[in-house]
Amino acid sequence: MEKTYNPQEIERKWQRNWQEKDAFKVSNEEYHKKYYDLVMFPYPSGTLHVGHVKNYVIGDVIARYKRMRGYNVMHPFGFDAFGLPAENAAIEKGNIHPEDWTMQNINIIRNQIKKLGISYNWEREVITCKEDYYKWTQWIFLQLYKNGLAYKKKAPVNWCPNCKTVLANEQVVNGKCERCGTVVEIKQLEQWYFKITDYAEKLLYDLEKLSGWPENVKIMQKNWIGKSVGAEVEFNLDNGKGSLRVFTTRPDTLWGVTFMALAPESPLVEELTTPENSEKVNQFLQRVSLQDRFKRTAEGAEKEGVFTGSYAINPVNGEKIPIYVANYILYEYGTGAIMAVPAHDQRDFEFAKKYDLPIRIVIMPEGDELTEENLEKAYIGEGVLVNSGEFTGLDNQTAIREVSQWLEDKKIGKVVTQYKLRDWLISRQRYWGAPIPVVYCEKCGVVPVPEKDLPVKLPRDVAFEPTGKSPLIDHPDFKETTCPKCGGKAKREVDTMDTFVDSSWYYLRYVNPKLEDKPFNKEDVDNWLPVDQYIGGVEHAILHLLYSRFITKVLKDLGYVSFDEPFKNLFTQGMIYRNGAKMSKSKGNVVSPEEMIEKYGTDALRTYILFMAPPERDAEWNDSGIEGTYRFLNKVWNTYMKIQDKIIHLENKPNYPLKNKSEKDLRRKLHQTIEKITSDIEGNFQFNTAVSSLMELLNELNSYLNNTDDKDWNLNLLKEFSEDFVLMLSPIAPHISEELWKNFGKDEFIFKASWPEIDKNALKAEEITLAVQINGKLRAQITVDVSLNEDEVKSYALEDDKVQKYISGKKIQKIIYVPKKIINIVVK
């Protein structure tokens, strides 16, 4: 055996051994005491940097630890392989197909992952762009379509002029495309949607079940779903040609409505604009269409609008009120129309001031007298109703309930629950995605592709030009087809599905990745799901996690699975920064894992990633840090080389004698560390303190070895210590641990060994340290044998030199002893 630590050689050896022996395989029949450990799969856009590596290492420590605790661990990996970057690469480079670009990157990343020693069961790999996967993504679409949960409609959508495709609301961040940062425009297009709004209440209510999720993620989902209870009120148009329906959470302010406002995107604008106002309205709409939708509706943005020429009638008092188009109204929220109460809503107040519209106070704060003349901003607090007909004098909270009931009684409104959540827009005008499995027949209309004809395959020979239309439009062999219903001529849907559809169910496919006649076997997924531990970035809190919860609930309702939440526990890891910024090629601050592995070894890289900060927090990369973890592992190696030959042939003895205090202290420290690291991993994955504890423990061992003549070493203690230490190290640094374990003559892989047991007796201290107070002030500390009785402890305290200094020549009135904690001596 090598006497010098050579991490690269050791790591290649054990990675080869694991692969040859299929070490991490688990069968579906091993679901008894199961543990499904899953890290969010990556998009294969290129090579990984150490920022990507963090969550894979976290997931691997958990997987290896759980195996040692006796669990059958499913720990699969795959690739979220459809998406724009592959298609953009084809457009930009002109000589590579998106599939080829994607598969090249997958091979690169797969090799990188294997060099990290991650214990994945590669037989379960899924790749979402392969036909054997997206066939079942299409199957899921068909199940939603058959059950009224997938539909097509024309609506204003978010359009990215750079990516040349539509975006779901969740993919727009501060008015910009989440992927490329381009300002998003609004277009009216026919698109496919999933009816996630049907599940809004379930998605909200079931957040309470998720006790193993971070609170901030649950709050983000709750806010995105955005439940509010209020009243829906009908405002008839004064021309008698219909009505405007508005939603309000403040029906108590109905008597303060002085105008109505429509979102610029609302189809009602065209209907309600009179001929004499059409030029002004169209000019306004043109100008607003160029504005960032989210900036224009932000709190401090300037409020602008134009009069449509139409009026509505306030149903509570019969007043005729003007209808405006206003830039601060969002079409997606509510009904796209609002009743404006300038006295009690700040945005309405600013608009009314600008256009000289009436402001009527209908809520008066108690003990104060507001007037329209002295009102400098909207009053939004609690108060008593004024100028509100029969409800005048009620406090506004009571009025909300009573006015809502009155509206229902008068049949001019009703109490409704509304959600900010909008249906999931899944159409994409791009090639590299799963084709939507429907055809359009002049005779039969929209016809779903029969399940037996799946998958609807992507053709390879397409032209990659970002025209704003799907490249599949110009592919006659793909587009032209026959109707599965009548056999006549038909055209295929040429849009593809949002890639979040692919990732909304992949955790199910891992259970049966090669099944050909269905996406998964119900019995198998019911045995293995929900995922016990899911690991990934908090940036997926709304998109991927919400969609996955939705799809799981749909599949449960349709009888395909027996659980309604996909992920029992969720851990969101922090990012790794360098030079104060997130790692990216454009910033030139990327740290390559290959370079670190070549220089320091995989185990040193893994150990540093875990040691640098609590795993949920962001951390700054520092080269000296990995140098430190390399030195630690080198010290582990050298220490084991020092003692190995003396203990290798020893049998493990359960109750060996400890000859002196240093041996007792070392064994106590060992079992304190087992207790601490077990707690660190079981509690909240505090791997940084686990690594720190191992470093401290190694120092204790070396202190014992250096301060004891080697002929006096307690070899039974060293045998127990060295085995338990390497067992605790193994989830963190598996390669060096496997090598040292083998050197102890062990035949099985170390992760198949049991996690060290805590000896509670070893934790008991033989000495205790007590605080000594004199007249209530701390004056000394004494260390005494734990077996001393109260009188002996008191005598020991009185003899202490520091205590003597404060009691000499004084009368002791009493001595109070709190066992194992404190002695208080009262003197006069």
Curated annotation (Swiss-Prot):
GO terms for cellular component: cytosol. A motif ('HIGH' region) lies at residues 42-52. Keywords: Aminoacyl-tRNA synthetase, ATP-binding, Cytoplasm, Ligase, Nucleotide-binding, Protein biosynthesis. The keyword Lyase does not apply. One of its GO terms (molecular function) is leucine-tRNA ligase activity. InterPro entries: aa-tRNA-synth_I_CS, Leu-tRNA-ligase, Leu_tRNA-synth_edit, M/V/L/I-tRNA-synth_anticd-bd, Methionyl/Leucyl_tRNA_Synth, Rossmann-like_a/b/a_fold, tRNAsynth_Ia_anticodon-bd, Val/Leu/Ile-tRNA-synth_edit. It catalyses: tRNA(Leu) + L-leucine + ATP = L-leucyl-tRNA(Leu) + AMP + diphosphate. It is an enzyme of class 6 (ligase). One of its GO terms (biological process) is leucyl-tRNA aminoacylation. It is found in: Cytoplasm. A motif ('KMSKS' region) lies at residues 582-586. CDD domains: Anticodon_Ia_Leu_BEm, LeuRS_core. Its EC number is 6.1.1.4. ATP binds at K585. Belongs to the class-I aminoacyl-tRNA synthetase family. This is Leucine--tRNA ligase. The lineage of its organism: Bacteria, Thermotogati, Thermotogota, Thermotogae, Petrotogales. The gene is leuS.
